[in-house]
Amino acid sequence: MAVNDALLARLGQIKGTGAVDAVFQKLGQSEILNAMKRECVFTKFVKTRNIKNGKSFDFQVTGRATAAYVEPGVPLLGGLGGNSPGDNNVKNIAVDGLMAADQAIYDLDQLMNYADVASEYFEQLGIALAWEVDKRIARILFAGANSTTEPLARSVNTGRIGFKKTLTAGYTAASKQARGDELASAIGDVKVAMKKKDVPTSGLVCVVPPDEYDFLNEGTRVINTDFNGGQSNGTIASGAVGRVKGIPIYESNHLIQPAYTLSTYDKNPDYAQDLTKCRALIFSREAVGMLTLRAPKFQMTTADSTFNIQYQATLGVATQSIGIGRLRDECAACIVIP
């Protein structure tokens, strides 16, 4: 110890040894660093139906009629040009098992905690349900985009299947600008393919993951005023992308997903999809349907309930009962990497 060093009494030590702040009080405040909210994009763009006292819902699939010349002396009996009312089908959407998210908070822990976290914990239960619905819709859209089975038999009704566009082998190693330009071109190809199948394109939307959204913003064409009639279609400054070939662009963290394994309570095998290579989903509201038997509902035990008395804890449960399925596969398309 140097001659001029002061011998300090360290008030935070225990018996003069160890950590110098061991006996100091730990202070906290009521601010909670909660999980960031994640927007659910897909849920906003599907056809929804609320049902009661049922397990499924049927959507009728009908086709086109044809015109032909009348043969003199031949009666019109309903089959001119091969027309047949029997060329129809049905799309059935079944309600899956009851989905829930729950949390039990021990009363003593809540009393000791300096922050009221119960409300935040219970809010996350509803968010968990919303996320699961959004991810399931994305998987069903991907299934529809990859469909190759025609729903009807007559040749005049062909083309009612999905569309998949595969990017080039060099896409993943290319620059941001190059990837943005290639993706924009692929979105245009999808729109043309849908037009050829008579799909109305006015209601199409495109959802991409955050990386691809940034690539479109970095590209040389999407936000370039020379390609947009002198009008703004997003800027580097704002980081926003407006439209590509007239299709509004959205971003979602639920687009790229690992392979999903079906559960016992999944009624639709189309949930089992692998979206690891998916880089865009283009679709309209007609592509997917969602049934709601029980809307999202939150329940919490009361202070004098049997659960609270027995476990000295508060239980919060969020539940919903839904079913999601393909409707018009021709209204769904995906863009994937090789």
Task: Locate each region found by the language model.
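Short, flexible loop/turn elements at secondary-structure junctions
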Residues: 63, 208-212, 320
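Generic hydrophobic, aliphatic-rich segments that mediate packing or membrane embedding
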Residues: 55, 76, 85-91, 97-104, ...
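Structured, hydrophobic secondary-structure cores that serve as assembly/anchoring elements
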Residues: 90, 95-119, 183-219, 223-225
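Alpha-helical scaffold segments that mediate packing/assembly in large oligomeric complexes
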Residues: 108-193, 336-337
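Short, surface-exposed beta-edge/turn micro-motifs
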Residues: 56, 201-204, 278-279, 313
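Sequence/fold signature of self-assembling virion shell proteins
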Residues: 2-14, 21-40, 64, 112, ...
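Assembly/oligomerization interface modules of large self-assembling protein complexes
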Residues: 31-99
